[in-house]
C-alpha cells in the first residue's frame, strides 16, 4: 500500500493534473500586470559598435534613434583599442529606454592588429562578471541594477567589395560565443548594386566556412517567423546613415546628396537601413535581451560557477547543497595547499642540497687554489733564498777582490813613493864619489 502511494505521489509530481475553474479567478490579468511593471521599471538596451575609425558608427546610431548623440571625435592615432560607453535616457510614448552605446575606439588603427579583439572581449566579460557578482550578493537588488551586459554587437564591415579582412574574421570568431553579432556593410552607397550583392554572398560564405556564428532572427514565434525568415536572407545588411534632410519631391527625407543624385536612407531600394531598424528595434529587441541573458550570460555564469566548484547533480544522485559544495571545495583547496606546501618544502630541501653541494665544490676549489698558491709561494720563496745566497756569495767575493785590489793599489803607491827617494840618494852618492875623484886626480 505504501509503495502504491509513493508511486502515485511520484506520478503526481511528474504530471500535474489539469483542472477546470468554476468561475472567474483573475490571474488572466498577469500579462497586463507584467506589462505595467515593465513600463514602470523601464528597459535597458546596450549596443556595441565595432568597426574601423571613420566608417560611420556614430552617424548610424544617430540615424537609428532619430536623434543626435554627443560623441567625441576619434582620431586614427590610438595606441590601442579602448571601449567608450555612453548612456542615454530615451523616451517614446510612455516607454523609457536606458540606451548604452559602446564604441570600440581605435579598432583597426594599429600596425599590429593581432590583439585588437582582446579589449572588446575583456569588456564584455567584465559586464558579465559585474552582473554575476550582483547575483551572488546576499542582499542583491537586481530591480535597481543597471544592466550593462552587451545585447547586440553591430559589426561594421568596410565596403571593399572583395572579401572580409582577417581582422574581421578573427574578431567575430572571438565574439560569437559572447554576444549577438549582426554584421552590417557600412557606407553601402560606395559600391554598385551588383558588387554589393556579390559582396554579401562572399561575406556569408566566409562566415560559414570559418565557423562564425552570427545572430539569426528567431523563427519560432509565429507572429514574427515569416518576416524574420525573410530578413535572415538579407544578412548582412547594407546600410547608409545620414542625419541631413534633403528635399525630394514635395517632402524632406533623410538622405545623402551627391552630384549624381540622392541616396535616401529610408528607401529600401537604396539601402537596408529600414530592415536593420525594424529587425533591431521594433521586432527583435526583446529577443536580443533574452538571448544575452539565457545564452551568452548563462554560458559565462556556468563556466565561472564550475570554476568555483559548483556542479549540477545527476538524475540518480542527491542534489548537492551549498554546504556540501563549500566543504568539498574547502577540502580540495586544503589538499591542494598541502600539496603545494609539500612541493615547496621538497623544492626548498633540494635547493638547500644543491646549495650545499655548490658550497662544498666552491670550498674544494678554493682549497685547491690555496694549496696551489701556497706551493707557488714556497717555490718563489726558495728561488728568492737561492738568489739571496748567490747575491751574498757574489758580494763577498766582490768584497774580497776589492780588498785585494785595494791592497795592491796601496802597495803600488807605497813603492812609487819610495823610488824617488832612492834616486836622490843615488844621485847624492854619485856626486860624492865624483868629487872625490876630482880631488885625487889633478
From Swiss-Prot:
Pfam families according to UniProt: Septin
Annotated spans, G3 motif: 103-106
Residues that hold GTP according to the record: 51-58, 106, 187-195, 241, 256
Residues with PTM N-acetylalanine: 2
Statement: the UniProt record of this protein carries the keyword tRNA processing: no
Keywords: Acetylation, Cell projection, Coiled coil, Cytoplasm, Cytoplasmic vesicle, Cytoskeleton, GTP-binding, Membrane, Nucleotide-binding, Phosphoprotein, Synapse
Annotated Basic and acidic residues bias: 377-391
Stretches the record annotates as G4 motif: 186-189
Region (Disordered) location: 377-442
Main location: cytoplasm
Record's compositionally biased regions (Polar residues): 408-420, 432-442
Gene Ontology BP terms: regulation of intracellular protein transport; regulation of protein stability; regulation of SNARE complex assembly
Region (G1 motif): 51-58
Localisation per UniProt entry: Cytoplasm; Cytoplasm, Cytoskeleton; Synapse; Cell projection, Axon
A molecular-function term among this protein's GO annotations: GTP binding
GO CC annotation: axon; cytoskeleton; presynapse; synaptic vesicle membrane
Keyword Nucleotide-binding: yes
Domain Septin-type G per the UniProt entry, residue ranges: 41-307
Residues where Phosphoserine is found: 10
Coiled coil: 322-410
PANTHER family, per database record: SEPTIN
Physiological role: Filament-forming cytoskeletal GTPase. May play a role in platelet secretion. Seems to participate in the process of SNARE complex formation in synaptic vesicles.
Similarity section: Belongs to the TRAFAC class TrmE-Era-EngA-EngB-Septin-like GTPase superfamily. Septin GTPase family.
Assembly: Septins polymerize into heterooligomeric protein complexes that form filaments, and can associate with cellular membranes, actin filaments and microtubules. GTPase activity is required for filament formation. Interacts with CDK14, SEPTIN4, SEPTIN5 and SEPTIN7. Interacts with VAMP2; the interaction inhibits interaction of VAMP2 with SYP. Interacts with STX1A.
Protein name: Septin-8
Species for this entry: Callithrix jacchus (White-tufted-ear marmoset)
Amino acid at each position: 500500500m505504501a509503495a502504491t502511494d509513493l508511486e502515485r505521489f511520484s506520478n503526481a509530481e511528474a504530471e500535474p493534473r489539469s483542472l477546470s475553474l468554476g468561475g472567474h479567478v483573475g490571474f488572466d490579468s498577469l500579462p497586463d500586470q507584467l506589462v505595467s511593471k515593465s513600463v514602470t521599471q523601464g528597459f535597458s538596451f546596450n549596443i556595441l559598435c565595432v568597426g574601423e575609425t571613420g566608417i560611420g558608427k556614430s552617424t548610424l546610431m544617430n540615424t537609428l534613434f532619430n536623434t543626435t548623440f554627443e560623441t567625441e571625435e576619434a582620431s586614427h592615432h590610438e595606441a590601442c583599442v579602448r571601449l567608450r560607453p555612453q548612456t542615454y535616457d530615451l523616451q517614446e510614448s510612455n516607454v523609457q529606454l536606458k540606451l548604452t552605446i559602446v564604441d570600440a575606439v581605435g579598432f583597426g588603427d594599429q600596425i599590429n592588429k593581432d590583439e585588437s579583439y582582446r579589449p572588446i572581449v575583456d569588456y564584455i566579460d567584465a559586464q558579465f562578471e559585474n552582473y554575476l557578482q550582483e547575483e551572488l550578493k546576499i542582499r542583491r537588488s537586481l530591480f535597481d541594477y543597471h544592466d550593462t551586459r552587451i545585447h547586440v554587437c553591430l559589426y561594421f564591415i568596410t565596403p571593399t567589395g572583395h572579401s572580409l579582412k582577417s581582422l574581421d574574421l578573427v574578431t567575430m570568431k572571438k565574439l560569437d560565443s559572447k554576444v549577438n553579432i549582426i554584421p552590417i556593410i557600412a557606407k553601402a552607397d560606395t559600391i554598385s548594386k551588383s558588387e554589393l550583392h556579390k559582396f554579401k554572398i562572399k561575406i556569408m560564405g566566409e562566415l560559414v566556412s570559418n565557423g562564425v556564428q552570427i545572430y539569426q532572427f528567431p523563427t519560432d514565434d509565429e507572429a514574427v517567423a515569416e518576416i524574420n525568415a525573410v530578413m535572415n536572407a538579407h544578412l548582412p545588411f547594407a546600410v547608409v546613415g545620414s542625419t541631413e534632410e534633403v528635399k525630394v519631391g514635395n517632402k524632406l527625407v533623410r538622405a545623402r546628396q551627391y552630384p549624381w543624385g540622392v541616396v535616401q536612407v529610408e528607401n529600401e531600394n537604396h539601402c537596408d537601413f529600414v530592415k536593420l531598424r525594424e529587425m533591431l528595434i521594433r521586432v527583435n529587441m526583446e529577443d536580443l535581451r533574452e538571448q544575452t541573458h539565457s545564452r551568452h550570460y548563462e554560458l559565462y555564469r556556468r563556466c565561472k560557477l564550475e570554476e568555483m566548484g559548483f556542479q549540477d547533480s545527476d538524475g540518480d544522485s542527491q542534489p548537492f547543497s551549498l554546504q556540501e559544495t563549500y566543504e568539498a571545495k574547502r577540502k580540495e583547496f586544503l589538499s591542494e595547499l598541502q600539496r603545494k606546501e609539500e612541493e615547496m618544502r621538497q623544492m626548498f630541501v633540494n635547493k638547500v642540497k644543491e646549495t650545499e653541494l655548490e658550497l662544498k665544490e666552491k670550498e674544494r676549489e678554493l682549497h685547491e687554489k690555496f694549496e696551489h698558491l701556497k706551493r707557488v709561494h714556497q717555490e718563489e720563496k726558495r728561488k728568492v733564498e737561492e738568489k739571496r745566497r748567490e747575491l751574498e756569495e757574489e758580494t763577498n767575493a766582490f768584497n774580497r777582490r776589492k780588498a785585494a785590489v785595494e791592497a795592491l793599489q796601496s802597495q803600488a803607491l807605497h813603492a812609487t813613493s819610495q823610488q824617488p827617494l832612492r834616486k836622490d840618494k843615488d844621485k847624492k852618492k854619485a856626486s860624492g864619489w865624483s868629487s872625490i875623484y876630482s880631488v885625487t886626480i889633478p
